[in-house]
Design a protein with these regions (language model features):
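Conserved "HGTGT" condensation-loop signature of ketosynthase/thiolase-family condensing enzymes
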Residues: 1-120
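Short glycine-rich or small-residue beta-strand-to-loop segments that form or flank ligand, phosphate
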Residues: 95, 123-129
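Gly/Ser/Thr-rich loops at beta-strand to alpha-helix junctions
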Residues: 12-14, 129-135
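A glycine- and small-aliphatic-rich helix-loop capping segment at beta-alpha/alpha-beta transitions
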Residues: 134-142
């Protein structure tokens, strides 16, 4: 049986970020008011985001960084009506596929540097994303 070792780790984040509080404020504005059973939707969203344990959100969807404003976020727009659910799964996965390769390449370069080995010595690549997936995956990015 072959043994394996994790020789290097590399991570990458999108360049722009927003505070959790700032994104909670933005999230509360994109929900159609009539889609909620409560008049206190902004307050409920704030509680949900505060309890998530996240401090900062990095996103490829932000055109610039700001502590508390997501004004450059255009992918998720304010709901037009109660049936408007925003971008569908296909649209979100297309955006993921467009953005993920660059981040994966950055993380892979860092992992190779951390391992101090040449790429031709790598036999397996493990990737993790909390945002989406594509098939074939980011391992074919070039």
């Amino acid at each position: 049986m072959n043994r394996f070792n994790i020789l290097g780790l590399g991570t990458a984040l999108p360049p722009h970020a927003i505070s959790q509080n700032g994104y909670a404020t933005f999230a509360a504005t994109v929900v159609a008011p009539e889609a909620c059973d409560s008049n206190n939707m902004p307050g409920l969203v704030q509680v949900l985001y505060r309890r998530a344990g996240v401090q900062t959100r990095h996103s490829v969807l932000l055109a610039s960084s700001s502590e508390d404003e997501a004004t450059a976020e255009r992918f998720f727009r304010r709901a037009k009506n109660i049936d408007d659910r925003g971008p569908g799964t296909a649209e979100r996965m297309n955006r993921y596929e467009l953005e993920a390769g660059r981040l994966a390449a950055t993380a892979a370069s860092k992992a190779l540097a951390d391992a101090a080995i040449d790429p031709e010595h790598v036999t397996h690549l493990v990737t993790v994303s909390c945002s989406g997936f594509s098939a074939p995956g980011v391992d074919l990015y070039h």
